[in-house]
Amino acid sequence: MTVRVAINGFGRIGRNVVRALYESGRRAEITVVAINELADAAGMAHLLKYDTSHGRFAWEVRQERDQLFVGDDAIRVLHERSLQSLPWRELGVDVVLDCTGVYGSREHGEAHIAAGAKKVLFSHPGSNDLDTTVVYGVNQDQLRAEHRIVSNASCTTNCIIPVIKLLDDAYGIESGTVTTIHSAMHDQQVIDAYHPDLRRTRAASQSIIPVDTKLAAGITRFFPQFNDRFEAIAVRVPTINVTAIDLSVTVKKPVKANEVNLLLQKAAQGAFHGIVDYTELPLVSVDFNHDPHSAIVDGTQTRVSGAHLIKTLVWCDNEWGFANRMLDTTLAMATVAFR
């Protein structure tokens, strides 16, 4: 069957989900029937077609009245502020992809359900009372038909959780720290301007800016045994896409750097193929732009100190990789629900 999807919020992730759907050739599996976005339809069409990070969209895009066309596919455009007023029942929506970055509570999910959607997938970490949180490649097999309101976690969680799992399974992690080196985001300023976070009052293109992160909480959500044993910090850097994560863990078993790399390389070629990639090429962040993997391990940066402290660098395209995981999780939800 083809999963009928509606997208709520047509920003960076919402637009990349549509592009990833068409570029990955999954239109027989997923069809987008509607997009709800407060911006005007002409602007939606323009930004879908022309993207500073990902270049021109190869498909023809046009807008006619209340419809957006990608090739010959018509997508209804809505501008509803109230979730309860969305016509999901009328449109026969199977899964709503809520890509607003604003909504994430069970109450918001239930509003989509009340409007007629069968399932809801948030494109960001949700509240603890959601049915489950998925990091595709790690725990999607735990999805059940009764899971209606689901979170796809965050781009950084999707990046680091598979690597942590691999290291923990092999060597037994005792504790760890994570530093996220993240490209600038829409909640920063082009030039100095007011913001509740005084660091984010400063021009994004001119500084490396420390910001708060809940990544440590995201890690312990998947690995409760690491509660109070993982910490995370984050900085934003003056690039517009791609993120690097510096992961340091202490492990129980003694290990060498080449053994760590061999473990991660084998995983990329085997059980985590398509989710984790591995490289030893002398690459920089722009080289990972438009990479569909959740995580790309940079084997040239792996270090081991004292046989028990592992440091490694993991890259991800925080937009494109995550958009592809949204599609993967959507299909996984539909498979268990509608089989």
Curated annotation (Swiss-Prot):
Keyword flag Cytoplasm: yes
Location (main, coarse): cytoplasm
Catalytic activity from the UniProt record: D-erythrose 4-phosphate + NAD(+) + H2O = 4-phospho-D-erythronate + NADH + 2 H(+)
Cleaved signal peptide residues: none
Keywords: Cytoplasm, NAD, Oxidoreductase, Pyridoxine biosynthesis
Location of this chain's protein in the cell: Cytoplasm
Keyword Oxidoreductase belongs to the record: yes
GO molecular function: erythrose-4-phosphate dehydrogenase activity; NAD binding
Site (described: Activates thiol group during catalysis): 182
An example Gene Ontology biological process: pyridoxal phosphate biosynthetic process
Pathway linked to the protein: Cofactor biosynthesis; pyridoxine 5'-phosphate biosynthesis; pyridoxine 5'-phosphate from D-erythrose 4-phosphate: step 1/5
InterPro entries the record matches: E4P_DH_bac (IPR006422), GlycerAld/Erythrose_P_DH (IPR020831), GlycerAld_3-P_DH_AS (IPR020830), GlycerAld_3-P_DH_cat (IPR020829), GlycerAld_3-P_DH_NAD(P)-bd (IPR020828), NAD(P)-bd_dom_sf (IPR036291)
Active site: 155 (nucleophile)
EC number: 1.2.1.72
Residues at which substrate binds: 154-156, 200, 213-214, 236
Binding site for NAD(+): 12-13, 81, 318
Self-association state and partner proteins as the record states: Homotetramer.
NCBIfam families recorded: E4PD_g-proteo, PRK13535.1
Assigned protein family: Belongs to the glyceraldehyde-3-phosphate dehydrogenase family. Epd subfamily.
Protein name: D-erythrose-4-phosphate dehydrogenase
Species of origin: Escherichia coli (strain UTI89 / UPEC)
